[in-house]
Each structure stands twice: as C-alpha cells, then as structure tokens.
C-alpha cells in the first residue's frame, strides 16, 4: 500500500499527507502501479468533462477536461515532452542534448510541442464517440507503456530521478505495468461492447517500442523527460485511433 501511495504522491498533486521512507527499490516497484495512477487521472478528467458537458458545448467541456488533467498531474509529463522536444530538435551532440533537457527554461521547440500536444488532445476528444470512456482510458494507455520504455534501458546520466527507474525495474514489474494497464483497457472495452478497442493495446505498445528506439538513437538511452514525452505521445495516439474508428463507423 505504501508503494501505491508513494506513486500517487510522486505522479499527481493529490494531497496525501503521509510520510514514507523512500528508496530506489520502492520507486522501481511502484512502476507496476503507474496504470492505476493513470486510471485515477482518467476518472478525474472524465468526471470534469461529464459535469461540464451539462453546462457547456462539447469543445468547452473537453477544454476543461484537458485542464483537469494538467491540474491533477501538475503537467508532470507535459514538462518532459517540452524538454525532450527542445533537446531532440536542437540538432546538437548527445551531451548537449542531455544538458538542454536539464535546463529549466522552455525553448521554441518545447513551446511548439506543448501547443500541439494540448491542441491535438482538445480537437481529437471533441470529435470522438464516447468521450467519457476515452478520457478514462487514454491516461491508462500512456502509463501502460512505461515499463517497456524503462526495462533494460540505459540511463545516460550519473544521477537524476529517472536513475531510480530506467534500467532498474525487473521483468516482473515491466510485465505487471503492461498487463495491468492493458488488462484494464481490454476488460473495460469488452464490458462496454467496444471490443475493437482491445486492438489499441498492441498498437500502443509497438509505438512505444518505436519511440524508445528513436530516443535511444538520439541520446543513447532514456531519461525521465523522455518517459514523460512517451506518455504524452501514446495518449495522443490513443485519442487519434479512437477518432479514426469513429470516422470509419467502427465505434458509434
């Protein structure tokens, strides 16, 4: 239970006032609970959307839902996306890219990445069927792939928060993270008769693998920032696949 509480404290702004003795082993074990945190975030933003849709047009309700996600997670992963974009698209050496990621200032590429991240989320969710369900599941998908991004990866720095996770989680933790996240998505979609969405799970995992290979080719490993970027990329992919299914009348 302490591991779950610690994971919630780390990845959200939910005020849980409990002191926990932290070590690297507990942090790495907590990766198995990341999809659970994704479910909490998803339920929160879906709840905000459900409340707002009774008062505002769909687009405004979606905007509030996206803002709700930022409020509950503090822009934790969005910050990683910005830092990753600034570094990867700087066209510098690996060493300089890693320095750019550590810079607290946001550059042009980071601003562009944040703009398109938020804009795509708002536009995609506005045009998807069953937005409440999709808003719940998308953050789970983003956390589901984290084990794959970390397992046996190289951490290209001597220290940092990512050092507690990257390359340190066990195969069991990686599989638990993937199976819990994927299992929840599959079960929910089957129970709601949207069985086709089960196909989204392997697509997201394959995309995450491709993302990892791309990042590793650029900086020689994975960092905490690239994990956050991966989560955002997979969420957007999840939304995009659902919109495509809506357009093709696969989901109604």
Map each language-model feature to its residues.
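Hydrophobic alpha-helical transmembrane segments
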Residues: 1-74, 92-98, 103-252
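Histidine-centered active-site/metal-ligand motif
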Residues: 77
């Amino acid at each position: 239970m302490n591991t779950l509480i610690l994971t919630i404290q780390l990845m959200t702004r939910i005020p849980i006032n409990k002191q926990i003795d932290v070590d690297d082993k507990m942090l790495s074990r907590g990766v198995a609970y990341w999809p659970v945190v994704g479910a909490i975030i998803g339920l929160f933003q879906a709840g905000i959307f459900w409340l707002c849709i009774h008062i505002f047009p769909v687009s405004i309700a979606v905007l509030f839902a996206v803002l709700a996600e930022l409020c509950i997670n503090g822009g934790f992963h969005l910050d990683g996306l910005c830092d990753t974009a600034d570094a990867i698209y700087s066209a510098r050496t690996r060493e300089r890219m890693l320095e750019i990621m550590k810079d607290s200032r946001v550059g042009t590429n980071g601003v562009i990445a944040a703009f398109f991240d938020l804009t795509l989320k708002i536009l995609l969710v506005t045009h998807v069927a069953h937005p409440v369900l999709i808003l719940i599941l998308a953050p789970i998908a983003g956390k589901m792939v984290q084990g794959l991004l970390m397992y046996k990866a190289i951490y290209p720095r001597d220290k940092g928060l990512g050092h507690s996770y990257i390359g340190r989680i066990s195969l069991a933790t990686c599989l638990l993270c993937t199976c819990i996240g994927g299992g929840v998505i599959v079960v929910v979609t089957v129970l709601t008769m949207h069985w086709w969405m089960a196909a989204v799970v392997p697509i997201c995992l394959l995309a995450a693998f491709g993302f990892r290979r791309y990042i590793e080719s650029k900086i020689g490993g994975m960092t905490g920032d690239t994990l956050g970027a991966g989560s955002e990329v997979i969420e957007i992919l999840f939304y995009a696949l659902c919109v495509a299914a809506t357009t093709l009348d696969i989901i109604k």
